[in-house]
Design a protein with these regions (language model features):
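Ribonuclease/tRNase effector modules and their secretory precursors
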Residues: 1-89
Length: 89
């Protein structure tokens, strides 16, 4: 059993926010609201040889099932992630 994933803070770059809108029709704030301080997230860890360790998290955004890629960020308070992307299915 994987331990629960808690996202206390989500870092979203301008480039990622623009990509979400242009490629996937999602607003970064919608993605943020689906994950930050939300319990019971379904996820799996993936260690990609090129991109490193990341969490692949399932969520529903605007009624669409999505997979969101989160990268752990070194932070003294912990539970901080950078948004990689979000893929509606």
């Amino acid at each position: 059993m994987v331990p629960p994933l808690w996202v206390a803070r989500l870092i979203v770059s301008q480039a990622t926010a623009e990509k979400l809108t242009a490629r996937h029709g999602l607003d970064w704030q919608e993605v943020h609201d689906a994950f930050v301080c939300v319990s019971g997230l379904r996820y799996a860890w993936d260690d990609d040889p090129e991109r490193g360790l990341r969490a692949l998290v399932e969520a529903e955004i605007r009624g669409w099932p999505c997979v969101v890629v989160l990268y752990p960020v070194e932070d003294p308070l912990g539970d901080v992630y950078a948004l990689g992307s979000a893929y509606p299915r």
